[in-house]
């Protein structure tokens, strides 16, 4: 006798499907649209995480470097330190990045990048060795259409227009730029450091660029040079102020400048730096010495040629000429000072020198 249990199997399948669908009030995850949407969202997030971001990196303070394009992704760089190490191998040099890449800034220096998630597609960043951003027109030598991002290409039009306007303004203002040597004195307690900076059409492109060069030369303890003042207390606000009547400027950092009279007065060392090389001022003082010796040197020759008024003068001339011809005769009066002849010779030894001094004084007068 055979028993048919097929209807029991179909009933069990139906009950299992109903229990699975009614557990959360939603269809089964295997056959629901919610599961397909979840899978799509997960794949999209994974693709976005693995998608490389195209960014450009510059060297801090290098206005002639066109930058290097990097494809930054989590597959290529496992951590932010790995990105810094790879940038060090690509960008490190002894001038702008002597200690490698340790910091990454935005192109305007307003923000410091701390992770790869903060990097945005199509943007530009500046790599630095120290915690100091140098404000330079980095995008001046770069084609603005390098990025495929539409938003970035639209934003890059503004710096291009600013660069064109700045170049036009520079062409208009080239008349007042002339070769000039200015003295920059560091503000603070004396003795203060002073440097001389040459300004011309090749070194003075903009006011910000001159401030950057002065910062590198003067090396303030507080960092960046923010303000410059003349000795009259007038603040320098534009490039045209460097080419006025003032040649000496006081460099100040972010700290509040103290308007004290002593800050605008120069001491002896600072005045020497203004005048130039200190050895140049000491040169004329040393020149009269050889002239005085040259005036003394022809003295004995002139006295030997001129006739003497007394016999003592003739003896004096005779002894002096013999002493000049034979240097051993100088030791004879000194060896026997007690003899009368030695006293006479010793007396005559100093006579021409005193006469020559009087003659030289008379000639100088």
UniProtKB/Swiss-Prot annotation:
Going by the UniProt record, its keywords in alphabetical order are:
Cell projection, Chromosomal rearrangement, Cytoplasm, Developmental protein, Differentiation, Disease variant, Epilepsy, Lissencephaly, Microtubule, Neurogenesis, Phosphoprotein, Repeat, Ubl conjugation
Q: Where is the composition biased (Acidic residues)?
A: 356-365
Where on the chain is Phosphoserine found, per UniProt?
A: 28, 47, 74, 90, 110, 115, 265, 287, 294, 297, 306, 332, 339, 342, 354, 360
The yes or no answer to whether the keyword Lyase is present is no
Name where it mostly resides. cytoplasm
Q: Where in the cell is it found?
A: Cytoplasm; Cell projection, Neuron projection
**Which InterPro entries does the record associate with it?**
DCX_chordates (IPR017302), Doublecortin_dom (IPR003533), Doublecortin_dom_sf (IPR036572)
Carrying Phosphothreonine, the residues are: 14, 289, 326, 336
Q: Name one GO molecular function term.
A: protein kinase binding
One Pfam match, given by its short name, reads DCX
Q: Does the keyword Cell inner membrane apply?
A: no
**What task does this protein carry out?**
Microtubule-associated protein required for initial steps of neuronal dispersion and cortex lamination during cerebral cortex development. May act by competing with the putative neuronal protein kinase DCLK1 in binding to a target protein. May in that way participate in a signaling pathway that is crucial for neuronal interaction before and during migration, possibly as part of a calcium ion-dependent signal transduction pathway. May be part with PAFAH1B1/LIS-1 of overlapping, but distinct, signaling pathways that promote neuronal migration.
Q: What disease is linked with this protein in Swiss-Prot or TrEMBL?
A: Lissencephaly, X-linked 1: A classic lissencephaly characterized by intellectual disability and seizures that are more severe in male patients. Affected boys show an abnormally thick cortex with absent or severely reduced gyri. Clinical manifestations include feeding problems, abnormal muscular tone, seizures and severe to profound psychomotor retardation. Female patients display a less severe phenotype referred to as 'doublecortex'.
Mind telling me what this protein is named? Neuronal migration protein doublecortin
- Source organism per UniProt: Homo sapiens (Human)
**Which lineage ranks, top first, belong to the organism behind this chain?**
Eukaryota, Metazoa, Chordata, Craniata, Vertebrata
